Regions:
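Feature marks short, surface-exposed loop/turn motifs that line or immediately flank catalytic pockets
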Residues: 71, 137-140, 189
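Polar, enzyme-active/binding microenvironments
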Residues: 43, 151, 185
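ATP-binding glycine-rich loop module of kinase domains
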Residues: 37-93, 104
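C-lobe/activation-segment region of protein kinase-like
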Residues: 146, 159, 163, 174-213
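Conserved kinase catalytic-core helix
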Residues: 83-86, 135-181
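Conserved structural core of kinase catalytic domains
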Residues: 89-147
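Catalytic toxin/effector domains delivered as secreted proteins or via bacterial secretion systems
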Residues: 65-66, 77, 94, 116-118, ...
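Arg/Lys-rich, intrinsically disordered low-complexity tails that mediate electrostatic binding
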Residues: 1-36
Length: 213
């Protein structure tokens, strides 16, 4: 039977080989460059677009952008009702979802690479990508006005029989007026009856996740 010292040395050699292999795999993964514009996956209300290798963000391998389709609503009737309630989208942002990649930042959107990305992605998708530049929200540190505004938005939905169904993680802040917008209506629905249970789930999610900081 090998001695304790021998077993320990063998384990070190094995871990060293594994570490080298992991580093090599990570390096190869980072070396892969996106061609841009190709649709990698598509769901019921959005699609994944291959990354663009834009110079300001070429330090890493590139980025994958998640863009929601503008003309293929999950629920056309729901979208029509939301537009009638909020035609300027000051409370409910529809399909103008910010990209997952840094290209949605204002510093990037202001430079001339926007035109290149629109050309590479296609005019429709490119327009959606840069039409809204929303910012993540710190759910635990809302101002009093932001908290009250979001509460009012939820009450407007419920008064018209609309439940969101997935509130946490789907609230963004508009960079100009600094007020919250509710996004991603994939799980939302209009209930013709007074569905108290679903409304209570919305209310519980609001009270649990959103706080004045």
């Amino acid at each position: 039977m090998p001695s304790y010292k021998s077993r320990k040395n063998n384990k070190k050699i094995k871990n060293k080989r594994k570490s080298r292999s992991s580093r090599r795999t990570y390096k190869n993964r980072r070396a892969v460059k996106g061609v841009g514009g190709a649709i990698l996956g598509m769901g019921k209300d959005g699609c994944i677009i291959d990354s663009l290798n834009c110079p300001p963000y070429s330090k890493d391998a590139g980025y994958v952008a998640k863009l929601f389709k503008e003309n293929h609503a999950v629920n056309a009737h729901l979208q029509a009702v939301l537009l009638s309630l909020d035609p300027d989208e000051k409370r409910f942002a529809q399909y103008k979802v910010p990209s997952d990649c840094p290209s949605s930042s204002s510093s990037f959107a202001d430079n001339e690479d926007v035109a290149l990305c629109k050309e590479r992605l296609g005019s429709d998708i490119g327009t959606i990508a840069f039409m809204w530049i929303l910012e993540p929200v710190d759910e635990k540190h809302l101002t009093k006005s932001q908290y009250r505004y979001l509460r009012e938005s939820l009450e407007i939905l419920h008064s018209h029989g609309i439940t969101h169904g997935d509130l946490p993680g789907n609230v963004m802040i508009h960079p100009i007026d600094k007020m919250p917008r509710i996004i991603d209506w994939g799980n939302a629905r209009i209930s013709h009856d007074d569905d108290a249970l679903v409304k209570q789930m919305d209310n519980n999610a609001f009270l649990m996740h959103f706080k004045i900081g």
